[in-house]
């Protein structure tokens, strides 16, 4: 609707003039038959729907009376659209003070008319068509077929079978490729299954196509195929798709923005406001040939305001879009944001996948009307897949395509479809809408055969394959072939040139003509950068936390080295190196968590790429720039305080060089981590290489192991490590040109006071005998091999890495697509699949037309009969007349009787004896209000809502999107977590007790389930924990089986829930949601929030019949519903109708045919409800619920002043007064908050969680793979380290690096915990399934065994390669110390888990929790005594050394690994001393060696030169770092106590922060 439209109105109905089918034989006139009558009705409905645009126009302009409007002719629509009163004025420069001001063109006006605005834009284009270059785009496809990458059944990957599964898949892939290469065959369709069977179609400019079919029929795949969005499945090479002469490849590469697919899910940046979201899109789609005299930003702002006004979003402009976890606009409003986003794009060919899901009936109809207006005026084309299509909406479509299990069974004019299927042999019941009738054809239990045709033995197609064959041989198919071939054969060179010129005219100056994008790369980066700045401004928590944590770490780490670094002697050599090493590491790894944010925004980037808004590389470039301020802020807050606290060289040049190097470090590593994130498909895939690189770069920086000491096989790592060059520059920067006074001479003491010259030497490396100082250049040359000439070389290398990683990151972002999603399929546990194969239910190779496991039972029976029939029979006859009679009878009941359903009849008849919990209690509420705090006060969401739900009744809760329907359910069910509730809520006149939440069933709008559980397991879990404790397991299991039977879930009862696309489909998930609540046997009532949302009409009907069935068994049901058909509406007993603001406009009986409700509104001033109108759409229209409509009066005030309201108040007063007298209160046992004991809850929840871990192989294998690779890498880096001084230091640093796996493993765990917590807090806690104690304790218990296993693996791949066992063998303690090391390794991995639970228990966002854990870990590691020994710490920080848990771990690992062995110095570690003349080395050094108690001489008898080693035992070396083997068991006990403390603190913090406290939220 919001594009620059075409000026020409010729050919508006192009393609609509197809013949009406085969000519009928001449017959005697017998009056109007049923088909003719139906045709007249169809025409009347079409004309009525077309006149709705005119009536809307009249209401807006003030002409005509909406109460007396009648159907207009089709030409009225054209006159309305192309009326001459629109002259084409500039709507952007309107001035309210201008006498010619037209408020209907001003989106900020309440009287804005989107229809007039589009007409006005059309007139502007017509006035200067050479400038605006209008064009149109249609599409035709021939032999379109698509296949998925896997079969329709697969087994679930687990920790045990995942390696074998992947090996099999790899082998299959390799062998297939080799086979095809050898035999020269195509890979297409070799493995996997066909989603779409060959089909044809054609949609011309100005047309609307509706695609109908049940979930799983292939509607989504068809839309994706014709919108060039085929990632995840393959299109057959034989397929031909053309868009006015352009191939799908050309469209994808050059004109992608003109063909757009809008997915069913609403994915947006949650922290952007509605205005910011749409304004960004408008900027990126602002054409160069826009209205003259208007700049880009003004035009984009106007288009944004028009979109918001058109779709009723103006009031939400400054509200965050939000998502399931970030509070924002309502679900219906979020769907409208998605619609507005595509409308602003102005694409000429749009594909909408279930775009009306979540919208109320009136808004959904207005959306289709808007599409119709857009198509008619702008000559665009739209294809819409709708599961629930109302009569009025269907009448607006030009063509319809019906799909059945991937087969096309009709494509043609929407007015002919009904007659086609009636001719095929299926009857349309009188009360059924055409769309519902067409969809019902694809459901064996819903469709009704023509009794006369059956009696005469006429064969009626039944299976999808038979209907497809019937379609291929029909006259309608031949007509379609003519249209498609005409489209394909038409010379389209002129149209191609027209489209090409129009595309170039829209593009900004610097955009390439062949580019599919409207604006240049520079403008894309600019606009996305602004968007990212808005996002950060709206939610700066992560950035603020990062900056503040860096500042805190600078103060902590800097003060740790403060005292020792005040000295400038040689004692600071090690600490200066350690401090610089710490600075490099901290700056380098501060960007590791950016990987998290990449995966959060990737789906949005991929969506916008398909809209041709911007290149993914532009988004990547902008995101890099948007993070620059945060990076600079963190660099300043960390490096400046840190530099001066650790007393590095006080020289301006040295300081700025230090700052420059660390800035380079930050950006080089940031780009590297972004590269890893962009090249990986999933977060676990990214974290494993990131953790390995983190470890490798840290170890091969040059501090832990100087390059001269590195093993030959691994030295190359230091050469490709950017940090090694940057560390070298910082060391040169600090040590060059400085002489450090010697702090310790060897030998020293009273006996050596008079020693001179070569008789003493400084103990530091690089010393020269006789000198009282050590040159900094000599030190770094001797120890590290660094030379001053390389100082600036490293800067160049660092900058080269930044540029290289940046371009690599942009490349991967541009060309690496996201993870593929397989075709929709059921997933079963491996054991179930084995049983199914034994029984012959599935086989390794599927036959071409074999029924799938998603096929319904009824159709399965039909197809099985077909397989056993004669092969020469094209169509099946029903073998039993009784079956056909039953079909007709059932269908009559379906559409005539309000109490039965065809689709449910069989299952209900089998399950009539199911003992559903019956309730006698009446649930009622009075004057219920709900207020939430906002910036300037409070906002009322519910305004004095009254009502009741009685046993055995079905009450509908209806209202526009955002009217407060879900909020009302949440308030009544005690599920609100903020705000103030006032009013009274009673059960039989008594206040709700604490057992109330578990005594009700609440089916949420979102189908929240544990994705790794099976359907049966989910139901049993609910039954075990929510049914009474005194009910036996056998009874609960039996009841679950009955629920499975009632809900018709037997076919997939053992299937894994999974995620949409790989698991249960939308319908199956909705049934499971209802089943989980039924399995709990709610004794009071059942709440259902949008149970029919996302379902097709037949499933929605079945769901409604299920609710009716439950009500007939005594259940009280309150159900919100968005798009009820007229048929569905009549199934409800009562209606609670809310308007915007949570205000009641009606509560009472619906009456037969909704007459009672209709009479009420008509009696209070509403215009008459047309006889064939949907009462739901009519009543939403009269209260102004649809965008662009307004109520003619205040229906809330009318309701409060009505007689019906007064009668309701009397009834409520009677209930409050009399009901407590008639019933007794609940017993103490019944009032328990939970049905089962805490211990039983912990047992079951832990059991379920253990299964989830086992069935989440990526998490476990990532954990173990990270452990194996990291520890093995450390082990072989320090392979068989000796006991020289450098070898001892290497072993100490190996132990230090052993703990570096902390961050990667913890970061893998946090998202898994968050998923568990979201499910628990959203569904299981509110329903009182189990307590918070059971939740947190089970999280703790289940992690421990896996971490013990990880610790065991780490021990074996680390302990033996490093060679610690050799030190133990010297003291004959091999087994004891090996066992001790294993205990500490296991304890450390359990500690990682305990810290993870601790930080995430009270923090919402995993990224913030990871930052906090990293902060704790760095502090613990810094103060553990390795980098800074206790003797050099300031007195203030001594307590940190004592409270750091790693102090005790490192102390224990050092002593267990190194103690009780001899030191053997290497040649360059031996100090050379010349003894006085006449003395041997032993005589000269003996006093010194006795005073220090350590050291040894290589040759004591020498009189010329002594070679002295400073240590003789590893125990002496351990003493320098305050480590002792005697404290090993004390250290183990203290470290274990820290683990226990973490777990206890996690439990306490979870209770403190996240458990709702009992408060008096409900006030009178």
Swiss-Prot record:
Keyword tags: ATP-binding, Glycoprotein, Membrane, Nucleotide-binding, Repeat, Transmembrane, Transmembrane helix, Transport
Topological category with respect to the lipid bilayer: Multi-pass membrane protein
GO molecular function: ABC-type transporter activity; ATP binding; ATP hydrolysis activity; ATPase-coupled transmembrane transporter activity
UniProt biased composition (Basic residues): 839-849
Residues in the Cytoplasmic compartment per record: 1-587, 862-1304, 1512-1564
Gene Ontology terms: cellular component: cell periphery; fungal-type vacuole; plasma membrane
Pfam families reported for this sequence: ABC2_membrane, ABC_tran, ABC_trans_N, PDR_CDR
PROSITE patterns per record: ABC_TRANSPORTER_1, ABC_TRANSPORTER_2
Chain ranges of the ABC transporter domain: 174-430, 923-1166
Major location category of this protein: membrane
InterPro entries xrefs: AAA+_ATPase, ABC2_TM, ABC_trans_N, ABC_transporter-like_ATP-bd, ABC_transporter-like_CS, ABCG_PDR_1, ABCG_PDR_2, Drug-R_PDR/CDR
Region (Disordered) location: 1-37, 839-872
Membrane-crossing segments per the record: 588-608, 624-644, 674-694, 699-719, 732-752, 841-861, 1305-1325, 1340-1360, 1390-1410, 1426-1446, 1459-1479, 1491-1511
Binding site for ATP: 959-966
Subcellular location per the Swiss-Prot or TrEMBL entry: Membrane
Entries under NCBIfam families matching the protein: 3a01205 (TIGR00956)
Family: Belongs to the ABC transporter superfamily. ABCG family. PDR (TC 3.A.1.205) subfamily.
Name of the protein this chain belongs to: ATP-dependent permease PDR10
Annotated organism of origin: Saccharomyces cerevisiae (strain ATCC 204508 / S288c)
Gene expressing this chain: PDR10
């Amino acid at each position: 609707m919001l594009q620059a439209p075409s000026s020409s109105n010729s050919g508006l109905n192009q393609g609509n003039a197809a013949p009406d089918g085969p000519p009928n034989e001449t017959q005697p006139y017998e009056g109007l038959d049923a088909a003719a009558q139906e045709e007249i009705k169809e025409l009347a409905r079409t004309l009525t729907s077309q006149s709705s645009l005119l009536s809307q126009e009249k209401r807006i302009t003030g002409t005509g009376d909406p109460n007396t409007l009648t159907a207009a002719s089709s030409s009225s629509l054209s006159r309305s659209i192309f009326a001459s009163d629109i002259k084409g004025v500039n709507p952007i420069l309107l001035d309210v003070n201008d006498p010619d001001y037209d408020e209907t063109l001003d989106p900020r006006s309440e009287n804005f008319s989107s229809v007039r605005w589009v007409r006005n834009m059309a007139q502007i284009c017509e006035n200067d068509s050479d400038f605006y270059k209008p064009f149109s785009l249609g599409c035709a496809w021939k032999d379109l077929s698509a296949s998925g990458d896997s079969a329709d059944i697969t087994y679930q990957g687990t920790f045990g079978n995942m390696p074998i599964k992947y090996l099999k898949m790899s082998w299959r892939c390799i062998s297939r490729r080799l086979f095809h290469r050898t035999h020269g065959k195509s890979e297409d369709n070799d493995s996997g299954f066909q989603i779409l069977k060959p089909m044809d179609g054609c949609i011309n400019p100005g047309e609307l196509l509706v695609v109908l079919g049940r979930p799983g029929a292939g509607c989504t795949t068809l839309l994706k195929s014709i919108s060039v969005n085929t990632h995840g499945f393959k299109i057959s090479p034989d397929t031909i798709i053309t868009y006015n002469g352009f191939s799908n490849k050309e469209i994808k590469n050059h004109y992608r923005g003109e063909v757009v697919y809008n997915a069913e899910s609403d994915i947006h940046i949650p922290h952007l406001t509605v205005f910011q979201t749409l304004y960004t899109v408008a900027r990126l789609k602002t054409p160069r040939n826009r209205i003259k005299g208007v700049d880009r930003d003004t035009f984009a702002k106007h288009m944004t305001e028009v979109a918001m006004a058109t779709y009723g979003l103006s009031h939400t402009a400054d509200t965050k879009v939000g998502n399931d976890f970030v509070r924002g606009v309502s679900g219906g409003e979020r769907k409208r944001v998605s619609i507005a986003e595509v409308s602003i794009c102005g694409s000429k060919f749009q594909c909408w996948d279930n775009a009306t899901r979540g919208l109320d009936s009136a808004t959904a109809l207005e959306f289709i009307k808007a599409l119709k207006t857009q198509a008619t005026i702008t000559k665009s084309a739209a294809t819409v897949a709708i599961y629930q299509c109302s009569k009025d909406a269907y009448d607006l479509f030009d063509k319809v395509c019906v799909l059945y299990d991937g087969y096309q069974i009709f494509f043609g004019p929407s007015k002919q479809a009904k007659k086609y299927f009636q001719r095929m042999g299926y009857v349309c019941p009188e009360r059924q809408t055409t769309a519902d009738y067409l969809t019902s054809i694809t459901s064996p239990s819903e469709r009704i055969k023509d009794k006369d045709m059956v009696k005469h033995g006429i064969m009626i197609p039944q299976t999808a394959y038979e209907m497809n064959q019937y379609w291929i041989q029909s006259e309608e198919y031949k007509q379609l072939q003519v249209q498609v071939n005409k489209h394909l054969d038409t010379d389209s060179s002129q149209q191609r040139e027209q489209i090409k010129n129009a595309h170039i005219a829209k593009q900004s100056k610097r955009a390439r003509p062949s580019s599919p994008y409207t604006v240049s790369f520079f403008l894309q980066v600019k606009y996305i950068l602004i968007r990212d700045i808005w996002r950060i401004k709206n939610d700066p928590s992560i950035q603020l936390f990062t900056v503040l944590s860096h500042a805190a770490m600078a103060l902590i780490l800097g003060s740790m080295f403060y005292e020792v670094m005040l000295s400038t002697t040689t004692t600071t050599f090690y600490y200066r190196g350690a401090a610089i090493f710490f600075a490099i590491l901290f700056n380098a790894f501060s960007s590791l968590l950016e990987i998290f944010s990449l995966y959060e925004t990737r789906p949005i980037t991929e969506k916008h790429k398909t809209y041709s808004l911007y290149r993914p590389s532009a988004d990547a470039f902008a995101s890099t720039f948007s993070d620059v301020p945060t990076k600079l802020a963190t660099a300043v807050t960390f490096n400046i305080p840190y530099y001066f606290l650790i007393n590095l060289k006080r020289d301006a040049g040295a300081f700025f060089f230090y700052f420059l190097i660390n800035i380079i470090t930050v950006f080089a590593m940031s780009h590297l981590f972004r590269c890893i994130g962009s090249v990986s498909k999933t977060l676990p895939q990214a974290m494993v290489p990131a953790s390995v690189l983190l470890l490798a770069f840290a170890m091969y920086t040059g501090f832990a192991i100087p390059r001269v000491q590195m093993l030959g096989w691994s030295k190359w790592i230091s050469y490709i490590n950017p940090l090694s060059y940057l560390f070298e520059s910082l060391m040169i920067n600090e040590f060059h040109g400085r002489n450090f006074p010697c702090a310790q001479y060897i030998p020293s003491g009273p006996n050596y006071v008079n020693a001179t010259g070569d008789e003493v030497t400084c103990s530091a490396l690089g010393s020269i005998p006789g000198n009282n100082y050590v040159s900094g250049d000599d030190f770094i040359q001797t120890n590290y091999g660094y030379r001053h000439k390389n100082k600036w070389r490293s800067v160049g290398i660092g900058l080269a890495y930044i540029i290289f990683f940046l371009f690599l990151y942009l490349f991967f972002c541009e060309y690496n697509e996201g993870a593929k999603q397989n075709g929709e399929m059921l997933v079963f546990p491996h054991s179930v699949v084995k049983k199914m194969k034994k029984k012959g239910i599935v086989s390794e190779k599927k036959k071409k037309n074999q029924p799938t496991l998603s096929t319904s039972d009824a159709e399965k029976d039909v197809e099985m009969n077909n397989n056993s029939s004669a092969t020469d029979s094209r169509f099946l006859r029903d073998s039993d007349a009784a079956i056909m009679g039953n079909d007709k009878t059932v269908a009559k009941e379906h559409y005539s009787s309000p109490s039965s359903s065809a689709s449910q009849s069989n299952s209900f008849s089998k399950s009539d004896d199911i003992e559903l919990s019956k309730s006698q209690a009446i649930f009622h509420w009075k004057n219920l209000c709900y207020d939430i705090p906002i910036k300037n006060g409070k906002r009322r969401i519910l305004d004095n809502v009254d009502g009741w739900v009685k046993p055995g009744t079905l009450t509908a809760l209806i209202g526009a999107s955002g009217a407060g329907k879900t909020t009302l359910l949440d308030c009544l069910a005690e599920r609100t977590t903020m705000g103030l509730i006032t009013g009274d809520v009673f059960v039989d006149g008594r206040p709700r007790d604490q057992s109330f939440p578990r005594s009700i069933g609440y089916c949420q709008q979102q189908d929240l389930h544990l994705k790794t559980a099976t359907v049966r397991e989910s139901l049993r879990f609910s039954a075990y924990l929510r049914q009474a404790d005194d009910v036996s397991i056998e009874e609960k299991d039996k009841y679950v089986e009955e629920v499975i039977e009632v809900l018709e879930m037997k076919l997939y009862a053992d299937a894994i829930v999974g995620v949409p696309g790989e698991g249960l489909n939308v319908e199956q998930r909705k049934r499971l949601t209802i089943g989980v609540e039924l399995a709990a046997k709610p004794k009071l009532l059942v709440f259902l929030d949008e149970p029919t949302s996302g379902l097709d009409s037949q499933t929605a009907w079945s769901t409604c019949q299920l609710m009716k069935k439950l009500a007939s068994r005594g259940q009280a049901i309150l159900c919100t519903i968005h798009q009820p058909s007229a048929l569905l509406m009549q199934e409800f007993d009562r209606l609670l109708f809310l308007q915007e603001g949570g205000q009641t406009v009606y509560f009472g009986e619906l009456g037969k045919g909704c007459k009672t409700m209709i009479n009420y509104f008509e009696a209070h001033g509403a215009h008459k409800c047309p006889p064939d109108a949907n009462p739901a759409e009519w009543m939403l229209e009269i209260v102004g619920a649809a965008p662009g409509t307004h109520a003619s009066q205040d229906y809330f005030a009318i309701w409060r002043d009505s007689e019906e309201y007064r009668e309701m108040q009397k009834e409520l007063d009677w209930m409050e007064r009399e009901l407590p007298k008639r019933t007794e209160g609940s017993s103490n046992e019944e009032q328990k908050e939970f049905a089962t004991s805490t211990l039983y809850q912990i047992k079951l929840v832990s059991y379920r969680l253990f299964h989830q871990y086992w069935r989440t192989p990526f998490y476990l294998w990532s954990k173990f793979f990270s452990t194996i690779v990291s520890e093995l890498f450390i082990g072989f880096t320090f392979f068989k380290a000796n006991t020289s001084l450098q070898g001892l230091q290497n072993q100490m640093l190996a132990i230090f690096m052993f703990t570096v796996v902390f961050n990667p493993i913890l970061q893998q765990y946090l998202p898994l915990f968050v998923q568990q917590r979201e499910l628990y807090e959203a569904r299981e806690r509110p329903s009182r399934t189990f307590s918070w104690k059971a939740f947190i304790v089970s999280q703790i218990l289940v992690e421990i065994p896996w971490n013990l296993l990880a610790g065991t693996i780490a021990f074996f791949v680390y302990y033996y390669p490093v060679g610690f066992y050799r030190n133990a063998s010297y003291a004959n303690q091999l087994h004891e110390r090996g066992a001790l090391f294993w205990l500490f390794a296991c304890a450390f991995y359990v500690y990682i888990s305990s810290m993870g639970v601790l930080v995430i228990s009270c923090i919402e966002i995993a990224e913030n929790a990871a930052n906090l854990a990293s902060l704790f870990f760095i502090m613990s590691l810094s103060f553990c005594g390795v980098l800074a020994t206790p003797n050099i710490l300031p007195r203030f920080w001594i307590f940190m050394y004592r409270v750091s848990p790693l102090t005790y771990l490192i102390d224990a690992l050092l002593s267990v690994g190194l103690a009780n062995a001899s030191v053997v110095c290497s040649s360059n570690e031996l100090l050379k001393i010349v003894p006085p003349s006449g003395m041997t080395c032993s005589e000269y050094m003996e006093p010194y060696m006795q005073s220090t108690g350590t050291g040894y001489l290589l040759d004591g008898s020498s009189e010329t030169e002594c070679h002295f080693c400073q240590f003789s035992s590893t125990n002496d070396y351990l003493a320098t770092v305050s480590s002792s083997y005697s404290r090993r068991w004390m250290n183990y006990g203290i470290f274990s106590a820290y683990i226990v403390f973490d777990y206890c603190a996690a439990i306490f913090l979870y209770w403190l922060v996240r458990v709702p406290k009992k408060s008096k939220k409900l006030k009178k």
